[in-house]
Amino acid sequence: MKQKPDLSFWKLWNLSFGFFGVQIAYALQSANISRIFRTLGADPHDLSYFWILPPLMGMIVQPIVGTLSDKTWCRLGRRIPYLFVGAFVAVAVMCLLPNAGSLGLAISQVMIFGLIMLMLLDTSINMAMQPFKMMVGDMVNEKQKAKAYSIQSFLCNAGSVVGFLFPYVFAAVGLANVAAPGIVPPTVVWSFYIGAAILIICVLYTTLKVKEWPPKEYEEYNGKANLSENVEETKKSEKSDWITLLRNAPATFWKVGLVQFFCWAALLYMWTYVVDAVAETVWDTRDSSSEAYQIAGNWTGVLYAIQAMGSVFWATMLPRFKNTKMAYAVSLVLGGIGFALIPFVPSQFGQIVPFLLIGCAWAAMLAMPFTFVTNALQGYGHMGTYLGLFNCTICLPQIIAAICGGFILHLVGGHSATMMIVAGVLLVCGAACVGFIHDKK
C-alpha cells in the first residue's frame, strides 16, 4: 500500500468542519428533549422512556452507515452522501419537533408525533455524525491522525457550547421564553431553527471542500480488504465470529465495560431529569408551563456549556496523573460529588460548581475507557470489530437506565432532584469498579 500523503491544516479542518454543525444539533437535542416533552405534557415518570431512542438508534444506525458506505461510490463520494442525507433529514426534523404542540393535535397524538420526530432526529444525527470519523480513517495518515482527531474534538466541544447556550442567548436578547401550556417557547423553537441553518451550512461547506478518493486511489492507500467487493465477505466473517471474539476478549474488556455501565446510566439520568432538578432546587417549581421552569431550562443549557468547558480543562490535567487508574477513579468520584451536590445548591450561580465537577467525569469517560481497552487488545487482532462491540457498553447501559428510570423516580418520591443523587451514587460505583481493571501497558 502507498503511504497516505500529509494534509495541510485546512484540509484536515475541512474534513471535520461539518461536525461543528452536527454537534450543535446533538447539543440542542441533549439539553432540550426532556424540556420539550415536559412542556408538551409528558409525565416525569414517563420521561426516561423517551430516552430509550437515542442509544438504540445509535446502536442500529452507526454500524449500518459504516457497512453501506464501504460499498458506496457516487459523484459525491463514499461517506459524504450519507452525511448529506442525514443532515437534510435532521434539518427538516429540527424545524418540526419543537412545533409539535402547535399543530392542534390531542396530547396523545402530540406525544406520538414527538416520538416519531425524535426517532428521525436520532437516526439522522447518527447518520450525519459517523461519516466524519470514517473520512479521517480513510484519508489521514497515522502521523496526522492525532491532529485530525484533535481538530474534530475542538469542533465537537465548540459546537456543544454553542448549542447549549442558544436558548439562554435568545432569551437575553428579548425573545419570549414562555408560551401557552403545551406549546414550546420561542427561545427553544428558534434555537432549533438557527441550529438547523448552521448544520446545513457546515455540511454544505464540507461537501464542497472535501473530495474523497475514488475506488482505485482508495485501494492504493487502504488496501483491497476495504474495497466494496470484499465487504460482504468480511462482514459475514465478522458476524459469525462475534461470539468467539467476545468469549476470547481480555478481562479488561469486560471490567471496563462494568465501569461504563454505571457511568452511562448516570449520564442518562442527568440528560433526562436535570432540567426538572434545577427547576425544583433553584426556582422551586415543577410546573413545566411556568416562566420559572423555562428560565431553569435556559440556565441548564448554560450549565451544560460550563460542563463542556470544564471537561476541556480537566482533559489537560489527566495526563499529569502518574497512575491512569487513579486519574479515572478520581474523575468519576468528582463527577459523583457534582451530581450529589445539585439538590443541595439553591443558588443559580452556585450550580456552576457541581457542573464543573461533572465535567471532570465527562472528560475521563471520553478518554480513559478506550485507552484501557486498546492497550489490552494489543496482539488480539480484530481491533475494529472489538471497538464496535465495545460501543455497546455505551448504548446498552443507557437503554437499561431509561427502562428503569420511571420506577426509580417513583421510589424516590417523584423528585427529579433526588435522581441526581442516584446518578452520583452510580458514578461512585463506577469509580469503585475501576479498581478491578488491570492496565496493560
What is each PLM-predicted segment?
Residues 1-9, 101, 105-116, 127-128, ...:
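Intracellular loop-helix junctions on the cytosolic face of multi-pass helical membrane proteins
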Residues 93-128, 350-366:
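Hydrophobic core of transmembrane alpha-helices in multi-pass small-molecule transporters
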Residues 43-53, 186, 284-308, 418:
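Loop-to-transmembrane helix entry
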Residues 2-57, 255, 259, 263-287:
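Helix-loop boundary and gating motifs at the non-cytosolic
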Residues 127-140, 364-379:
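Intracellular juxtamembrane helix-capping segments at the cytosolic ends
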Residues 44-45, 142-154, 379-390:
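Loop-to-transmembrane helix entry/capping segments in MFS-fold secondary transporters
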Residues 83-108, 334-346:
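C-terminal ends and interior cores of transmembrane alpha-helices
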Residues 325-369:
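C-terminal transmembrane helical hairpin of 12-TM major facilitator-type secondary transporters
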